[in-house]
Amino acid sequence: MHGVTDRDFRQVHSKFFTPADAYYTPFLSPTATHRLTPKELREVLPENNVGITLEPQLLCASAPDFVWAAGELAAMGYGEVNLNLGCPSGTVTAKKKGSGMLEDTELLRKFLDGIFEGSAVRISIKTRIGSSSADEFSRLAEIFNDYPIKELCIHCRVRTQQYKGAPDLSAWETALRVCRAPLCYNGDIFDAPSAERLLSAYPETQAIMLGRGLAANPALIGEISGGAALDAERLLCFHDELFALCKERIGCEKPLLLHMKELWTYLGCSFEESAKPLKAIKKSQTVSDYLSAVSTIFTHPVRTNAGFIN
């Protein structure tokens, strides 16, 4: 998740909770300059991702730029990269990036030809089921079946939905039937019961990509696997170490607080009756006020089946 699950989050999460089989970077946006920004470089440097499996995610509309970035990542030791065809942001799709590429299947095929022919690494893809209609998915599946995709992660909404409405599980059922690549489900797995419902309805599901649910409940992977539920003590340790890392890296008070407040948009969902302390967190202007508000929210019980509330 862009701006939340960065390298600090990944390192602290894997220390205190059941780690993900693979973490994905916030998307990197290679351009014709063929330079990674300092921020992008910090995200992917192997020394910043010790002890976890990391898959860099690329968002671009130029096959040569993708191939260049994949080559740079291969030189760092990465054997696999992820192509983001799922981002629905208007500023992204207007440039035919992310899910903006799905509406032009000729352009999509030309792009995929270029990256699969030119890249020396394995490529996984995250996609949506279409641009404006789920009826588009059958055609997209035919296209994806022509390439050696390492894994196809499907967010079961169309681009125009953004994150509104329910995921289209009939599209997931179709994907399980017709797609050749190994599949990964994505969409509204916000807590352990929602994962259980999906796996009960579609037991052939082999993988799930978590987003907002994991940001709200860092114990979610363990809970889905039958492990211990989220508890306040472990969550507080997670928060305190993450805060210390972010403070060391960011330094300045205002951007530090902005970063932590964004995280609390998700973490706050896992506490009962959290509206008042969350408001205090969001209104805090100093680190002292912020930490005082955080102490207050930790006096509230953690919700049973904690997770994101839409």
Tell me the role of every PLM-derived stretch.
Residues 1-310:
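Flavin-dependent oxidoreductase catalytic cores
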